[in-house]
Amino acid sequence: MSTVEEDSDTVTVETVNSVTFTQDTDGNLILHCPQNDPDEIDSEDSTEPPHKRLCLSSEDDQSIDDSTPCISVVALPLSENDQSFEVTMTATTEVADDELSEGTVTQIQILQNDQLDEMSPLGTEEVSAVSQAWFTTKEDKDSLTNKGHKWKQGMWSKEEIDILMNNIERYLKARGIKDATEIIFEMSKDERKDFYRTIAWGLNRPLFAVYRRVLRMYDDRNHVGKYTPEEIEKLKELRIKHGNDWATIGAALGRSASSVKDRCRLMKDTCNTGKWTEEEEKRLAEVVHELTSTEPGDIVTQGVSWAAVAERVGTRSEKQCRSKWLNYLNWKQSGGTEWTKEDEINLILRIAELDVADENDINWDLLAEGWSSVRSPQWLRSKWWTIKRQIANHKDVSFPVLIKGLKQLHENQKNNPVLLENKSGSGVPNSNCNSSVQHVQIRVARLEDNTAISPSPMAALQIPVQITHVSSTDSPAASVDSETITLNSGTLQTFEILPSFHLQPTGTPGTYLLQTSSSQGLPLTLTTSPTVTLAAAAPASPEQIIVHALSPEHLLNTSDNVTVQCHTPRVIIQTVATEDITSSISQAELTADSDLHSSDFPEPPDALEADTFPDEIPRPKMTIQPSFNNAHVSKYSDQNSTELMNSVMVRTEEEIADTDLKQEPPSDLASAYVTEDLESPTIVHQVHQTIDDETILIVPSPHGFIQASDGIDAESVLPLTTLTDPIFQHHQEESNIIGSSLGSPVSEDSKDVEDLVNCH
């Protein structure tokens, strides 16, 4: 990496050692520039890896004494043939009026670092030995075990899936193949002989596990849905005809081989359905205690052959017996207590205390021990799955970040009972609606990709949004003669046009050009004037979004109206700053002149008015200043730009028919909206601990997404699985635990395994 000096205002990039690069599931390259600690950098015994430190400083101030904000940039993926790439970022900061100049626009150019190759996950012989072995026999497994090798089992983590998808993408790109299914399902063994070994790089799992994972990901027949009665009958006939030839049976039914194998294993002609009778429950308890040599009242969660139990019970399948026992009957007989909200919070805290990097490392048996309200370790894990779904993007964040987000979410709910009451009531329009949530990311495209828009470098910022649909009949109509968009009251902090925009310096100090996807330029001038005007025509797009952040001080201490008048479909985002943000302008007005005519819109627009705001809204813990001055510049320089957003909510009326709202929206829409905005427990977190550092927005799921109580009954939804890797269970002869519904082939499934042996 080198220093770039094109202009006098170009920021110098100093390299301590190297830059951290990772890739997400979308194949985007993530560049992380962490905050530097001078003492840590100069310390000889620092344990921080050198590739996680990067210093950014301006040319006129080479010191790193001042705090430098952490920056996470997501760029387009690198081609394997690229020797270098360029990242150009346009950024603005809050500065005093006399300091506002073109120098506030920062341009950073970063070259590809040769040390990237040294950061390959293939650095250890142990990982390579495991990921290059098929493990189709017990001897293969024992051989590597005796050599001291260990490997990961159980559920796949987000990081592992990211590595796998990235490896597949690179393999396809290197060979000019567009779809991985061509390799997986169409190529011969010889043609794809290096495929699985290549995509297993960096994964501490055997090739057989990678093979099974890839098949389930790419085989559309594995996600067909519930078996119909007709399919069940056909499956029985095919099983008699073809035996254990699961591939042939699956092809005849249009389903995957693993799917039909699992269904056959659970299929019995004598199974009852519906509620269990007292006689069935009694029989189940007797059989379990008899087979495990335990007494009634003893807790039994492991070492049970559910196939043997089902055979002895006679009227239920092994899945039904297992679910009934682990979810209810064993807990009831042992005198267990009901699960409460306090237990839910306690579970989060206990998992946090474990300090594990991946949830697959949790010992659920140990965690459930002595917990009277926990019905079984398996039940506790399923409860955890329910809890983590409170975070809408839980699949996209690392486990430590997820835990921290859940802790903060429950802390916010605990400290804001009024918000919880409002969310659960019928007066909030978004209490049962679906949301569209994305990460907070800065996506930076290469210069050559933006030539059609502008020859100058620019950055496209994508904002995460939570959408609530509002009917046009619920708001009073505005004047049909209005052709402007006016937002009065509060401090104007941001203005965005989605789905994307480009911010380009115009050459005039303090003035930037908002370049939209429709190639319409909207010059934006940052001044101390109470009015900030966007000249020229606003884009006549139904996806136009105005972002207006209202000052918490203003919302809590004034009764002025907030009026929105426009002829385009209404999409308004209201945001509230975090506790470290002060009010830069006491009063601001945004006016956008439009070319649109009222004749283009047959229906009149709405006006959203709020005369007062509820007194019970808790005052944010923040220092409010009436105006911005030079004394506060340091406050802004210390903050990560993504932390300026505390809550984001978008309200539209175009897709009301698609919502699942069961109640009538309140008449005072604005009051309800502002209450929701002020207390939305959206969390922005900057990760520093791992190589996969990135800035992440954790967004709580809508209130209606997760039921307050599970209402677990006889037919629980607990998945049929165990706490060990199902792929290797058939090798463990000493275990009587039945595998999961994802069960691996047993020894007689010769066709499934023999195909694998010949792949290498």
From Swiss-Prot:
User: Where is the stretch described as Required for transcriptional activation?
Assistant: 87-170, 459-760
A molecular-function term among this protein's GO annotations: DNA-binding transcription factor activity, RNA polymerase II-specific
Tell me, in one coarse class, where this protein mainly resides. nucleus
Q: Which residues lie within the region annotated Interaction with CCND1, CCND2 and CCND3? A: 176-690
What do the Gene Ontology cellular component annotations say? nucleus
Q: How does it assemble?
A: Interacts with the D-type cyclins CCND1, CCND2 and CCND3. Interaction with D-type cyclins may modulate transcriptional activation by this protein.
Q: Which residues form the Myb-like domain?
A: 225-263, 339-388
The record's family statement is: Belongs to the DMTF1 family.
Which BP terms from GO are recorded?
positive regulation of transcription by RNA polymerase II; regulation of transcription by RNA polymerase II
Q: Which stretches of sequence are listed as region Disordered?
A: 24-63, 593-614, 738-760
Protein name stated in the entry: Cyclin-D-binding Myb-like transcription factor 1
Q: Where is the composition biased (Acidic residues)?
A: 37-47
What does the PTM comment state?
Phosphorylated by the cyclin-D2/CDK4, cyclin-D3/CDK4 and cyclin-D2/CDK6 complexes and to a lesser extent by the cyclin-D1/CDK4 complex.
Q: Which SMART domains match?
A: SANT
Arranged from A to Z, the UniProt key words for this protein are: Activator, Cell cycle, DNA-binding, Nucleus, Phosphoprotein, Repeat, Transcription, Transcription regulation, Tumor suppressor
Keyword NAD appears in the UniProt entry:
no
Query: Origin organism of this chain?
Result: Rattus norvegicus (Rat)
Residue intervals of the HTH myb-type domain: 268-333
